[in-house]
């Protein structure tokens, strides 16, 4: 994977999100797979029309965009990237639980749960 592709990635990860990714990867469940990255992708569905999905993945395709941000690596496929361009991924902990959140400048509307959006 070229450094140009890695450096051109248009999504940022907050320190809180990066810390959580590193914590998850170093947990006992993934101790033998330290090459994991946070894959962020978009699926149709949810009350807003599109949903954000997050998984830990050790696979990177040639057409994936990859960035290292605050010590964690994020991977996004080209289709999802068009919807996430310029976004910021954060990690939130509150009374109702904890989750990754996306601040997406492309979203015209976001549902109250924050997990789905429309364009």
From Swiss-Prot:
Q: Which Gene3D superfamilies match?
A: HesB-like domain
Ordered alphabetically, the record's keywords are: Iron, Iron-sulfur, Metal-binding
Q: Which InterPro entries match?
A: FeS_biogenesis, FeS_cluster_insertion, FeS_cluster_insertion_CS, FeS_cluster_insertion_RrpA, HesB-like_dom_sf
Could you tell me what the cofactor note in this record states? Answer: Binds 1 iron-sulfur cluster per subunit.
A Pfam family this protein belongs to? Fe-S_biosyn
Q: How does it assemble?
A: Homodimer.
Any one GO MF annotation of this record? iron ion binding
**Source organism's superkingdom?**
Bacteria
Would the keyword Transferase be found if you checked this record's keyword annotation? no
**Gene Ontology biological process terms in this record:** iron-sulfur cluster assembly
Family, per the entry? Belongs to the HesB/IscA family.
- One Gene Ontology term, aspect cellular component: cytosol
Q: What gene makes this protein?
A: erpA
- The positions annotated for binding iron-sulfur cluster are 47, 111, 113
**Cofactor(s) in the UniProt record:** iron-sulfur cluster
Q: Does the keyword DNA repair apply?
A: no
Function per UniProt = Required for insertion of 4Fe-4S clusters for at least IspG.
Protein name (Swiss-Prot/TrEMBL):
Iron-sulfur cluster insertion protein ErpA
């Amino acid at each position: 994977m070229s450094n140009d592709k890695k450096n051109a990635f248009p999504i940022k990860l907050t320190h809180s999100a990066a810390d959580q990714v590193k914590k998850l990867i170093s947990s006992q469940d993934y101790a033998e797979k330290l090459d994991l990255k946070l894959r962020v992708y978009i699926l149709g569905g949810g009350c807003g029309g599109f949903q954000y999905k997050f998984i830990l993945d050790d696979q990177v395709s040639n057409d994936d965009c990859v960035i290292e941000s605050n010590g964690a690596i994020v991977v996004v496929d080209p289709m999802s990237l068009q919807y996430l361009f310029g976004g910021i991924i954060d990690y939130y902990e509150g009374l109702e639980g904890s989750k990754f959140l996306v601040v997406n400048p492309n979203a015209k509307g976001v549902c109250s749960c924050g997990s789905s959006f429309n364009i």
